[in-house]
C-alpha cells in the first residue's frame, strides 16, 4: 500500500512459480504498477521466448518485452494494450515515452527486462527503463502519513514504519491521532532511513519518504 512501483524478479531458469503468482495477485489487489526483471538468463535452459509466453499466459497478456524497445513491432504491441494508445499509434505510427509511462502507471502495460544480475547483464537497461517510464507522484503540502508496520529493535525501541504522503516530517514534531475514542499526541524522537538492518538518522523526511519513527506508542 506504500509502493509507487514494484519490480517483480522472476528466475529465468524456473519461470513463473506459485509464489510469483501470489505476489502478482497482491500487486493487483493493491493496484501497484509493475516492472518485471527476468533474472538468471545466463543459465542453461533459460529460453526468452518461452518465458515471455509463460509470463503472458500466467500473469498478464500485457507484459511486453522492453528489451526490444523501438524495434519494429514494439509500439504496435504496446498500443494493443489500451484503446486510446492504439488510436494514437494508428494516427501517428508511434507512441511517446509519456504515453507508455501513463499506461504503466495505470497497470495497462507491464515492461519486461531480461538479464543476469550476477553478471550485471540487463540491469542497466532496467534502471534506464525505471528512469524513463516511472513518474513521481504529486504530494500535497499538508502533512500526511500512512503507517504500514510496527516493530521493535534489539534494544527494545518501538519502531513505527510509515510513508510520508504529504508535507515534511521533522524530528520533534508532534503527531496527532485517534485510538478508538481517545485522541493522542506524541513527539517524534528519531527518524530513521533503513537499508537492510542498517539505518541513517535524519532530521526530516519529505513526502514520498519511507522511514521508521521512534517515540510513538499509540500507533
Q: Where are the model-predicted features located?
A:
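Structural and coupling elements of P-loop NTPases
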Residues: 1-219
Amino acid at each position: 500500500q506504500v509502493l509507487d512501483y514494484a519490480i517483480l524478479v522472476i528466475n529465468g531458469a524456473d519461470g513463473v512459480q506459485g509464489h510469483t503468482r501470489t505476489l502478482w495477485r497482491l500487486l493487483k489487489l493493491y493496484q501497484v504498477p509493475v516492472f518485471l526483471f527476468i533474472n538468471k538468463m545466463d543459465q542453461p535452459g533459460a529460453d526468452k521466448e518461452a518465458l515471455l509466453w509463460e509470463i503472458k499466459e500466467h500473469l498478464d497478456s500485457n507484459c511486453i518485452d522492453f528489451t526490444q524497445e523501438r524495434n519494429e513491432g514494439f509500439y504496435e504491441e504496446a498500443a494493443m494494450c489500451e484503446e486510446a494508445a492504439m488510436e494514437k499509434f494508428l494516427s501517428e505510427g508511434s507512441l511517446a515515452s509519456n504515453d507508455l509511462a501513463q499506461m504503466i502507471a495505470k497497470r495497462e502495460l507491464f515492461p519486461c527486462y531480461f538479464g543476469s544480475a550476477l553478471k550485471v547483464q540487463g540491469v542497466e537497461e532496467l534502471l534506464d527503463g525505471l528512469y524513463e517510464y516511472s513518474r513521481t507522484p504529486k504530494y500535497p503540502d499538508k502533512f500526511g502519513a500512512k503507517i504500514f508496520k510496527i516493530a521493535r529493535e534489539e534494544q527494545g525501541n518501538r519502531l513505527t514504519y510509515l510513508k510520508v504522503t504529504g508535507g515534511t516530517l521533522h524530528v520533534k514534531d508532534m503527531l496527532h491521532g485517534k485510538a478508538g475514542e481517545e485522541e493522542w499526541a506524541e513527539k517524534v524522537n528519531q527518524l530513521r532511513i533503513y537499508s537492510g538492518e542498517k539505518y541513517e538518522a535524519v532530521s526530516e523526511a519529505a513526502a514520498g519518504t519511507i522511514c521508521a519513527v521512534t517515540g510513538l506508542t499509540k500507533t
